[in-house]
């Protein structure tokens, strides 16, 4: 059984569908089961990262867990990161953590802190460090359609955005195939945008 946290989010919904279509037993961990829309045949479980007992219950009995951590500050993550790591480690599940490319350069970021907590406590882990999500550029559509210029704080920055379904495909592979244990992968899109 594979537990997908953030199962109704940008990546999670694609991952649940991907695993379900491969006839993998998948459990969707969601904050509010009454509002969650999951494919027929997929079980959901209530989980809120602010309630450690719910996290422990959600991952109990899992063979693998896709772990998604909200973008909190590094200090907020540091407060509970060790507890989360211990819960995931005690479950005995393989863990794939969706991190960010920035974790490598920012050791005090929430991503780096959570990576460290998982690596310290979980026997079998994989880290996916993503660049920007492609869907985030949709916020520019109204601005562009109105004839305006999109302004970016770093005018010469080049980004390689990745579609959320592609992240889900990579996550599914790491959750199913044990050859990815102990690996860190940086996931990027097919081309760089300036």
Describe each model-derived feature in a short phrase.
Residues 45-47:
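Cofactor-binding loops of NAD(P)H-dependent oxidoreductases
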Residues 2-39, 50-53, 60-62, 71-78, ...:
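Oxidoreductase cofactor-interface core, primarily capturing Rossmann-like NAD(P)-dependent enzymes
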């Amino acid at each position: 059984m594979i537990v997908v946290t953030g199962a109704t989010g940008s990546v999670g919904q694609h991952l649940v569908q991907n695993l379900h279509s491969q006839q993998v037993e998948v459990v969707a961990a969601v904050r509010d089961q009454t509002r969650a829309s999951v494919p027929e045949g997929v079980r959901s479980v209530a989980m809120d990262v602010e309630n450690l007992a719910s996290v422990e219950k959600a991952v109990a009995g899992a063979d693998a867990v896709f772990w998604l951590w909200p973008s909190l500050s590094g200090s907020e993550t540091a407060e509970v990161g060790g507890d989360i790591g211990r819960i995931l480690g005690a479950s005995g599940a393989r863990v794939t953590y969706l991190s960010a490319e920035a974790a490598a350069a920012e050791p005090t970021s929430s991503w780096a802190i959570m990576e460290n907590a998982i690596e310290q406590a979980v026997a079998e882990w994989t880290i996916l460090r993503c660049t920007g999500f492609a869907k985030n550029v949709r916020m520019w559509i109204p601005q562009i359609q109105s004839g305006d210029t999109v302004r970016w704080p770093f005018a010469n920055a080049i980004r390689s955005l990745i579609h959320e379904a592609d992240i889900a495909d990579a996550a599914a592979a790491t959750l199913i195939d044990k050859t990815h244990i102990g690996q860190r992968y940086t996931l990027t899109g097919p081309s760089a945008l300036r």
